[in-house]
Amino acid sequence: MRHGHPRLLPGLLMLLLLPLGAAAQKTSGCARWCPPKSTCVNATTCRCSPGFSSLSGEIFSSPLESCDDIDECGPPPLVSCGRLADCQNTEGSYHCMCSPGYALASGATTFMNESENTCRDVDECQLKPRVCKSRGICTNTKGSYTCKCPPGFELNLGDLNLCTDVNECTSGQNPCHNSTHCLNNIGGYECRCRPGWKPVPGSPNGPKSTVCEDVDECSSGKHTCHYSTVCINTVGSYKCRCRRGWKPKPRFQDRQLNTTCEVPAEMSFPTWTPPPGIKSQRLSNFFERVQELHRDFKPALAQETIQDLIQEVDELLEIPGDLEALPHSEQHCVATNLLVGLEGVLRNVSQAMPNGPWTFNASAGTDLSLEVQEEGYRNVTLSQNLAKMMLKWDVVHKSGDSGPSVVGLLSTPGMGKLLAEAPLVLEPEKQAVLHGAPKGLLQGVSSVLLSDVISVFMSNKVTQKLSSPVTFIFSHHSATHEPKLKVFCVFWEHSQDECGHWSTRGCTVVDSGDTSTTCQCTHLSSFAVLMAHYDVQEEDLVLPVITYVGLGLSLLCLLLAALTFLLCKAIQNTSTSLHLQLLICLFLAHLLFLMAIDRTEIKVLCSIIAGALHYLYLASFTWMLLEGLHLFLTARNLMVVNYSSVSMLMKKLMYPVGYGVPTLIVAISAASRSHLYGTRTRCWLNPEERFIWSFLGPVCTIFSVNLGFFLMTLWILKSKLSSLNSDVSTLQNTRMLTFKAIAQLFILGCTWCLGILQVGPAAHVMAYLFTIINSLQGVFIFLVYCLLSQQVREEYGKWFKGIRKTRAESEKYTLSSRAMSDVNKPMMVN
């Protein structure tokens, strides 16, 4: 191995020997062909410089030789640099260098041999803190380093020291919900709600878990729609649409965010004409003024038109003039015309009003509260001095309608003058409530108007059966709570055939105090609070006694008759089978009536009892019909009663008809109007909506058919009697059939007709007749079918004889036993 300073020595010697060489050439000669990197030895040989060699060695004599660099680093290596170092050949020499990532402890860059090797790892991360660019994280390794990128970054393939941002939004590496959109940022991303959306309750706006929902700008008031338009929410946005009946202004388009609309000139004041046949100068003057308002109406002046109309109505009712001289019936017609006309005009003209609540007042007390609003999900309350109305907005806004809706409450205190002595029509159920006792008889009703008359109108014209009831709170004159006085919530009902009357249909009193009454109604019209005075006949205490005693006897007789037909085998045939089914149905119906007719505490139970009574009584009447049919067929086939087709026909028909027909009627009634089973005072059919005819209709039909059977039976028997021979048995059978036909008509329906005839002056008498005869129906049946039947009497005789014989044998056995006992006593003593 060579050292740094010794390498300089050959060079210096060469410089010193040059003059000598030149002299020697001159003297001894030197080869002129020596190649580069060599020196002349003599005239025939050359020597390669240190670090170079030729093929022949260090000294050569051929002019074709050249001196080439000796590669000390090999292969094979001529020197050893040691571990973590690399040999670097140089022209004429070499040096050792630490491998990349390593350096000498001295700080030098080269060394000559392994003994000088002090290479150790270089920490590039400390040496060059910014070796990893753009947020890269440097990690030192043996002899090198690596750059790692934080989340949201990745290494640049062109420069492994450079970290570049990952765009998660375009790469599909984000889990954002579809209700959000991805926003890329340096090193990450956000899930932000889309425009027009908002985070759902409990969800933040930005993190990966963000979930959004549409913002209803319309209901939240976060829209910029002009008052002439209606806000319509869309997914992520909204539109502004012209109100119903309006049109966009010039240079504007409908359904845009900046839409502005105007009222079209064709929105008209509806035609309103006076009632026909009414002669009144005061009314004529009023309608002349109405025609002026109609002629001058412009949608832009809707507010002024409504105010003028309210004032005109107010003045008419304050000073009615010659209207007061009209008969009450004609005054009622005028009131109906005013109420209906006002409702129509105000409904139409209000469509031109801007959104918002409005109030109109007149000097004499006529007031109008109006609300024009978009569709909402809230309660609406309109108030005046003496009345308040509360309803749900979905009642006002008809499904499918566009634009805002209108609801108005009009109070007309002066309308009571025209409605004086107006008739009051009470529902049957309200009549029962009036007199408080279901057995009392209502004699007469007179009414007094306590409150102002209010009218309700809305843009939705379908108001006959509202989805939810409307609540009214009336403040009125003090009501006297005495017997024979009752407060009612009423509305003004009119038709084409009559001018109108007060009615309670669909309205109920929720609460009533001395000066305030709360009502609920399922329809809209003109409403008021009436106090009705009535006379009630005192309840007759004798009728319940007759009912319970008579039904008790009937139950006993029905039970005896049923046991007779069930246990007596000798008399059983088709006729007795019909009798037995009739007796069972009547027995169960009377028993249920006695035990449960007043069980009204639990409404569901009361409805079930009413349905059971409905079924049992209808089944009784159906079996009565089959009795009449069988009697008619028997009379027609008098001579072959037991061998004709009558028996077979009745056996096939009686059970399906007897129990199937009433089942069908009750099933249809319960499916259509189940809520009408049971009243407040009785577990029977509610007379509302003519539901009672689901019982009376079949009863009347059966009675009519039985009457026909009776007449035809009499006609057949009459012809039989005229053609009979002297056969005594046939004559007796025919007479018995004639008697049964007469009794059948009386039992099978005539008594029930008396119940329908309980009206007018004879109602009290009819009530007694119906109660007595109907409650003793079981007694009549036992008398006709058992006691007056020779076969049954004979069977009863056999039973009694058997009972006496059994009793006699029992007594004989007892006496014999005693005699034997007396004989044995002395023997036992002995």
From Swiss-Prot:
Glycans are attached at residues 42, 113, 178, 258, 348, 361, 379. Residues 23-540, 598-603, 673-690, 766-767 are extracellular. It is a multi-pass membrane protein. The keyword DNA-binding does not apply. It is found in: Cell membrane; Cell projection, Ruffle membrane. Residues 26-68, 69-108, 121-159, 165-203, 214-253 form the EGF-like domain. Its main location: membrane. It comes from the Eukaryota. Keywords: Autocatalytic cleavage, Calcium, Cell adhesion, Cell membrane, Cell projection, Disulfide bond, EGF-like domain, Glycoprotein, Inflammatory response, Membrane, Repeat, Signal, Transmembrane, Transmembrane helix. It holds the Pfam family 7tm_2. The keyword Ion transport does not apply. Residues 489-537 are annotated as: GPS. Forms a heterodimer, consisting of a large extracellular region non-covalently linked to a seven-transmembrane moiety. Interacts with chondroitin sulfate; the interaction with chondroitin sulfate is calcium-dependent. Interacts with CD55. Cell surface receptor that binds to the chondroitin sulfate moiety of glycosaminoglycan chains and promotes cell attachment. Promotes granulocyte chemotaxis, degranulation and adhesion. In macrophages, promotes the release of inflammatory cytokines, including IL8 and TNF. Signals probably through G-proteins. This is Adhesion G protein-coupled receptor E2. It comes from Canis lupus familiaris.
